Each structure stands twice: as structure tokens, then as C-alpha cells.
């Protein structure tokens, strides 16, 4: 196994992608936010003191995709062509699954943009609901799918 973010002397570098051809790159990532079922019921019914939690989280996630190189030092600045956030809720369990999809016509993948997008949307949900529920947790930030480029398509298997 090799890590390509290091040179021969072990120093951190940004990977040189200048020789690659741009291709359509897509990645989908997810993050899970767990809270009390009553907190989720209030969130979904619009009974929070901070407004439209999922609407704000959606905008935060989209903005985060565009800001990824400012947060992840060795990621490449990319021209993001599409960023979208979707939410799946399970009221009985009190969970919100954030799903972020990012697309770009680039020389390198958009996995980090999708993961950052999902994570920041989840953090925004936490921030906007923490006053009502101190026990909220964020977990399972994960890549679900990627395609484009030399490595082709990858999809997480169910339960993985």
C-alpha cells in the first residue's frame, strides 16, 4: 500500500494531477445524526427555536463542498458543478441520515468534497438542535459511491 501524499523523503505534498485528463467525477457520502425521537419530531414539525434546521443544513453542506480545500490541506481546489444534500429520517430511532452528492468535470475525484459536505450538514443539525437535546451524536461519516477517473466506479456494499 502506498500513500501518494508524501514524497521520497516522507514530506507532505499535494498530488500532481496535471497529467490526468478531466473526466466527470461523482461521489456520494453520508453522515448519521442520532437524537431523541421527540427532538426529531420537533425538528420535522418546525417546532425548533432556530428555524428550518434541514434547510440551513442543506445550504451549509453545499457551501462546505465548495470550501473543502480550505479545510483539508492537501485536497485540490475544484470547480464543483453540482452539490446536493438529501435527508432520510427514521422517527422511531431518532436518526437523520445526511446524503451529499457532488459532481465535477475534473482531474481528481470529489470524494473529500462529498464527505466534507455530509459532515458539515450533520454538524449544522447538531448545532441547531443542541439546545433541545444535549445527547445528539454524529457518526458513520462514510463514502457511499464514487465514479469517474482511472479507478472507475466503487459502491459501498450494504451493511459495510
UniProtKB/Swiss-Prot annotation:
SUPFAM superfamilies associated with the record: Molybdenum cofactor biosynthesis protein C, MoaC (SSF55040)
GO molecular function: cyclic pyranopterin monophosphate synthase activity
EC number: 4.6.1.17
Pathway in which the depicted protein is active: Cofactor biosynthesis; molybdopterin biosynthesis
Binding of substrate, residues: 74-76, 112-113
Catalytic residues in the record: 127
UniProt family annotation: Belongs to the MoaC family.
Subunit note: Homohexamer; trimer of dimers.
Broad enzyme group: lyase
UniProt name for this protein: Cyclic pyranopterin monophosphate synthase
Swiss-Prot/TrEMBL keywords: Lyase, Molybdenum cofactor biosynthesis
Annotated function: Catalyzes the conversion of (8S)-3',8-cyclo-7,8-dihydroguanosine 5'-triphosphate to cyclic pyranopterin monophosphate (cPMP).
Gene source species: Geobacter sulfurreducens (strain ATCC 51573 / DSM 12127 / PCA)
InterPro entries: MoaC, MoaC_bact/euk, MoaC_sf, MoCo_biosynth_MoaA/MoaC, Mopterin_CF_biosynth-C_dom
Keyword Lyase: yes
GO-annotated biological processes: Mo-molybdopterin cofactor biosynthetic process
Catalytic activity of the protein: (8S)-3',8-cyclo-7,8-dihydroguanosine 5'-triphosphate = cyclic pyranopterin phosphate + diphosphate
Pfam families cross-referenced by the UniProt entry: MoaC (PF01967)
Amino acid at each position: 500500500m502506498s500513500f501518494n501524499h508524501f514524497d521520497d523523503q516522507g514530506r507532505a505534498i499535494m498530488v500532481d494531477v496535471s497529467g490526468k485528463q478531466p473526466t466527470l467525477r461523482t461521489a456520494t457520502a453520508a453522515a448519521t445524526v442520532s437524537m431523541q425521537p421527540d427532538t426529531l419530531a420537533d425538528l420535522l414539525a418546525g417546532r425548533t427555536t432556530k428555524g428550518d434546521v434541514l434547510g440551513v443544513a442543506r445550504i451549509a453542506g453545499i457551501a462546505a463542498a465548495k470550501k473543502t480545500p480550505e479545510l483539508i490541506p492537501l485536497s485540490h481546489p475544484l470547480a464543483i458543478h453540482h452539490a446536493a444534500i438529501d435527508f432520510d429520517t427514521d422517527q422511531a430511532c431518532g436518526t437523520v441520515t445526511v446524503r451529499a452528492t457532488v459532481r465535477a468535470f475534473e482531474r481528481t475525484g470529489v470524494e473529500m468534497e462529498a464527505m466534507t459536505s455530509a459532515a458539515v450538514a450533520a454538524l449544522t443539525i447538531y448545532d441547531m438542535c443542541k439546545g433541545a437535546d444535549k445527547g445528539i451524536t454524529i457518526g458513520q461519516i462514510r463514502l457511499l459511491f464514487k465514479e469517474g477517473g482511472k479507478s472507475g466506479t466503487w459502491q459501498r456494499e450494504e451493511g459495510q
